[in-house]
Curated annotation (Swiss-Prot):
Laminin EGF-like domain sequence ranges: 287-342, 343-405, 406-455
Role of this protein: Netrins control guidance of CNS commissural axons and peripheral motor axons. Promotes neurite outgrowth from commissural axons but acts as a chemorepellent for trochlear motor axons. These effects are mediated by distinct receptors.
Disulphide-bonded residues: C121-C154, C287-C296, C289-C306, C308-C317, C320-C340, C343-C352, C345-C370, C373-C382, C385-C403, C406-C418, C408-C425, C427-C436, C439-C453, C474-C546, C493-C603
SMART domains listed in its UniProt record: C345C, EGF_Lam, LamNT
UniProt keyword annotation of Secreted present: yes
Keyword field: Cytoplasm, Disulfide bond, Glycoprotein, Laminin EGF-like domain, Repeat, Secreted, Signal
Protein name as it appears in the record: Netrin-1
GO cellular component, one term: extracellular region
Domain NTR: 474-603
Region forming the signal peptide: 1-25
Length: 606
């Protein structure tokens, strides 16, 4: 039988949706006529630039299971259909039997192919009257943006009815719309309340579409955006975007229309005439994809999900896919696709995160921060070399070998961090080279790890033979060493200190020779607490002239001496009583033994 009761543009919308139903129902034979050519992706324009795209408008209820709280036929029961002939009402009674397909009225008839010439109707048990109710619950399978909910009746329309929606797959329910001739009594709502910007996300109650007539074929159609003040600017109305979103729809029939004869003597016949019967339940809308997909598909688990584009992800394309966090996720609009943008990590990172503060500081252009930069890079964009590496300017920053190791010399360099651009290591005094691996001009290598390069003396220091004539009384003044001298525990114990020195340079200072020496090892400490490193050695000019001690530049010696005050109150003094012997490497072990014996108090016995 033809539909009646739809009004205005909504009727055209419902008609178009009804005509589209067979195509949605799955007739594979129709596909043989389809042109087998690749269709352009609606989510991108002809230049490949992203643009808003939305799935097709569908009747999302078609073919889906509806859970109902009451269905006639279990056990078989009588029902009577009321028709009007003039002013007379005529009842014709029938049997509802769930086990007989010809007499059954199952819930599947709510969402099957609706053929006006062969109506199939779901039907409830007779006379389920207020305060009892009958509910129809439909799961859409995922979030949809619902445009309308419509029901076409085989019975008179309910006197009171409510439509609810769920956004969390039936865990909680929110009112969508109320219909009643007594809104205040049934739902504690005023009838036909004005919709304003302040309450446009609230359900209202209306007494329209609640007449008892027509007795069959009546339509109730609820438009989710009709009369909502900001519907014209839906893209910029998060309130309405949330309002139309649903995963489930529930219809509650609260109160039957009656003719007032249900309490008369033959009330049993009358009560068998009052029931709810619906030939078609439609939920028109689009798969919710936030403007980032043009269709919904089945995933591996057979769940309905958006086929996301614009680098988005999620069942509703409601987040950016991994590594595309350079700006925050946004819903696409007619003006801006708001695609997610990949982080700029110069091919050195696989993960990143979004930082709102950086995004704001950049003028809302970039907020991505790269995580775990590889290939020896560092920084928010993996755009410079980490400590200990420098840029190889012959390669782009995106190259996996864009950063080279500094390779600073472990002795010549003052640290392992080099210049990020040139690779120049920080060199110690007198050291040069990009890795600090050689002595600078005017310097020569030493064996000291502290000062590996020392300045070359301008001229060799004068010796006793060249600078000062040997005094005539040297034989009576001191006894110069001749041949090889030996060291023993007794000699070691008699002296205040014992050190290995390297003579670096010498200069005359009045009656003294001032030697710059490098103390390589300390085998015995005096009161002045000698330490390794550069030190000043003072020797009286007469002692040098008499060759006691006899020293030469750039030679190493073992010096055993006594603690005396030096001319400038710094350094150490060697005199004719000091023991200065050219160094032999074999002495190191013997001197360590002397040192251990001294610690045990052996020097006091010697």
């Amino acid at each position: 039988m033809p539909r009646r009761g739809a009004e205005g543009p909504l009727a055209l919308l419902l008609a178009a949706a009804w005509l589209a139903q067979p195509l949605r129902g799955g007739y594979p034979g129709l596909n043989m006529f389809a042109v087998q050519t690749a269709q352009p992706d609606p989510c991108y324009d002809e230049h490949g630039l992203p643009r808003r795209c939305i799935p097709d408008f569908v009747n999302s209820a078609f073919g889906k299971e509806v859970k109902v709280s009451s269905t006639c036929g279990k056990p078989p029961s009588r029902y009577c259909v009321v028709t009007e002939k003039g002013e007379e009402q005529v009842r014709s009674c029938h049997l509802c039997n769930a086990s007989d397909p010809k007499r059954a009225h199952p819930p599947s008839f709510l969402t099957d192919l609706n053929n006006p010439h062969n109506l199939t109707c779901w039907q409830s048990d007779s006379y389920v009257q207020y305060p009892h109710n009958v509910t129809l619950t439909l799961s859409l399978g995922k979030k949809f943006e619902v445009t309308y909910v419509s029901l076409q009746f085989c019975s008179p329309r309910p006197e009171s009815m409510a439509i609810y929606k769920s956004m969390d797959y039936g865990k909680t329910w929110v009112p969508f719309q109320f219909y009643s001739t007594q809104c205040r009594k049934m739902y504690n709502k005023p009838s036909r309340a004005a919709i304003t910007k302040q309450n446009e996300q609230e359900a209202i109650c209306t007494d329209s579409h609640t007449d008892v007539r027509p007795l069959s074929g009546g339509l109730i159609a609820f438009s989710t955006l009709d009369g909502r003040p900001t519907a014209h600017d839906f893209d910029n109305s998060p309130v309405l975007q949330d309002w139309v979103t649903a995963t489930d729809i529930k219809v509650t029939f609260s109160r039957l229309h009656t003719f007032g004869d249900e309490n008369e003597d033959d009330s049993e016949l009358a009560r068998d005439s009052y029931f709810y019967a619906v030939s078609d339940l439609q939920v028109g809308g689009r798969c919710k994809c936030n403007g980032h997909a043009s269709r919904c598909v089945r995933d591996r688990d057979d769940n309905l999900v958006c086929d996301c584009k614009h680098n988005t992800a999620g069942p509703e394309c409601d987040r950016c896919k991994p590594f595309h966090y350079d700006r925050p996720w946004q819903r696409a609009t007619a003006r801006e696709a708001n695609e997610c943008v990949a982080c700029n990590c110069n091919l050195h990172a696989r993960r990143c995160r979004f930082n709102m503060e950086l995004y704001k500081l950049s003028g809302r252009k970039s907020g991505g921060v790269c995580l775990n930069c590889r290939h020896n890079t560092a920084g928010r964009h993996c755009h410079y070399c980490k400590e200990g590496f420098y840029r190889d300017l012959s390669k782009p920053i995106s190259h996996r070998k864009a950063c080279k190791e500094c390779d600073c010399h472990p002795v010549g360099a003052a640290g392992q961090t080099c210049n990020q651009t040139t690779g120049q290591c920080p060199c110690k005094d007198g050291v040069t080279g990009i890795t600090c691996n050689r002595c600078a001009k005017g310097y020569q290598q030493s064996r000291s790890p502290i000062a590996p390069c020392i300045k070359i003396p301008a001229a060799p220091p004068p010796t006793a033979a060249s600078s000062t004539e040997e005094p005539a009384d040297c034989d009576s003044y001191c006894k110069a060493s001749k041949g090889k001298l030996k060291i023993n525990m007794k000699k070691y114990c008699k002296k205040d200190y014992a050190v290995q020195i390297h003579i670096l340079k010498a200069e005359k200072n009045a009656d003294w020779w001032k030697f710059t020496v490098n103390i390589i090892s300390v085998y015995k400490q005096g009161s002045n607490r000698l330490r390794r490193g550069d030190q000043t050695l003072w020797v009286h000019a007469k002692d040098i002239a008499c060759k006691c001690p006899k020293v030469k530049p750039m030679k190493k010696y073992l010096l055993l001496g006594s603690t005396e005050d030096s001319p400038d109150q710094s350094g150490i003094i060697a005199d004719k009583s000091s023991l200065v012997i050219q160094w032999r490497d074999t002495w190191a072990r013997r001197l360590r033994k002397f040192q251990q014996r001294e610690k045990k108090g052996k020097c006091r016995k010697a």
